Curated annotation (Swiss-Prot):
The lineage of its organism: Eukaryota, Fungi, Dikarya, Ascomycota, Saccharomycotina. Component of the eukaryotic translation initiation factor 3 (eIF-3) complex. This is Eukaryotic translation initiation factor 3 subunit J. Belongs to the eIF-3 subunit J family. Component of the eukaryotic translation initiation factor 3 (eIF-3) complex, which is involved in protein synthesis of a specialized repertoire of mRNAs and, together with other initiation factors, stimulates binding of mRNA and methionyl-tRNAi to the 40S ribosome. The eIF-3 complex specifically targets and initiates translation of a subset of mRNAs involved in cell proliferation. It comes from Kluyveromyces lactis (strain ATCC 8585 / CBS 2359 / DSM 70799 / NBRC 1267 / NRRL Y-1140 / WM37) (Yeast).
Length: 277
């Protein structure tokens, strides 16, 4: 008896399931399961989908606005806007539209690397910055006077003349408040302080100019003092007028050419030699 004489029956299930060619084919059918490096490694337990669903169910849900509350809020907002004037209402609507456009642009181009600031928003911001810069800053005692354009733009002789006129008008107007403080606390010390950077020749010219001013002031004060006295003159004196030499009015009886008759003897030689005494 030999092995060739034996008959082997082929199982009927071989037609439905193909025969594996190698051990690799067996593992290839189960691609979803990872291959363990050793038989001792335990397979990790897969998370149960039921646990994730239960956690999601326990999470608090955001309350969605009720349909009845939304029209009421919109109605109140519209009523507040309607109470404003046209200019303010248009400005609010324009800002709301701009904000809506920015939000839509951010949602649309958020992941494409587009600049975050919208061109319209950038233009609006630049306009507000220019308006803020154009407004003059409030002046205080701590504000440096050198920041004034009259000082910062000093270049030509005309600029210095304009500065001199502005300072003279502003400083001399303070004399009306207190002439004593103006003279003793401002003018004299100011002339001394501003003369320090000057040369000796310039100081001499300043003294000569002040001497001319002093003589003019003396003449004006003397004329004002004499004007108060009736008949006063600018040359001084007590203010009295000199009497003019005039003839007394004796009437028509006394004339130069009239002959006067005294009623006596005109012969003054009637005395004798013995009538001497």
């Amino acid at each position: 008896m030999s092995w060739d004489d034996e008959d082997f029956a082929v199982p009927s299930g071989s037609k439905e399931k193909p025969v594996l060619n190698s051990w690799d084919d067996e593992f290839a059918e189960n691609d979803d399961e990872p291959v363990l490096e050793s038989w001792e490694d335990e397979e990790t337990a897969k998370p149960k989908p039921k646990a994730a669903a239960a956690a999601a169910a326990k999470a608090p849900k955001k309350a969605s606005p009720s349909p009845a509350a939304t029209p009421a809020a919109t109605k109140n907002t519209m009523l507040d806007i309607d109470t404003l004037d046209d200019k303010t209402r248009k400005e609010l609507l324009r800002k709301a539209e701009l904000e809506s456009d920015l939000n839509n642009a951010a949602d649309l181009f958020g992941g494409l690397g587009v600049a975050e600031e919208h061109p319209r928003a950038r233009a609006e911001r630049e306009r507000e910055q220019l308006a803020a810069v154009a407004q003059p800053a409030a002046l205080t005692k701590d504000t440096p006077i050198q920041s004034h354009p009259l000082f910062s733009d000093l270049e030509t002789k005309k600029d210095y003349q304009e500065l001199r006129k502005a300072l003279a008008t502003a400083i001399t107007s303070t004399s009306n408040k207190s002439l004593l403080n103006y003279s003793g606390g401002l003018a004299i010390d100011l002339i001394r302080d501003i003369s320090k950077p000057m040369t000796v020749e310039n100081i001499r010219q300043t003294i000569a100019t002040l001497n001319v001013l002093m003589k003019d002031k003396e003449r004006e004060e003397r004329q004002a003092r004499l004007a108060k006295v009736k008949g006063g003159t600018a040359t001084g004196g007590a203010g009295k007028k000199k009497a003019k030499a005039t003839r007394a009015n004796l009437g028509g009886a006394f004339k130069k050419d009239n002959d006067f008759d005294l009623g006596g003897n005109d012969n003054f030689d009637d005395f004798g030699e013995d009538d001497f005494m």
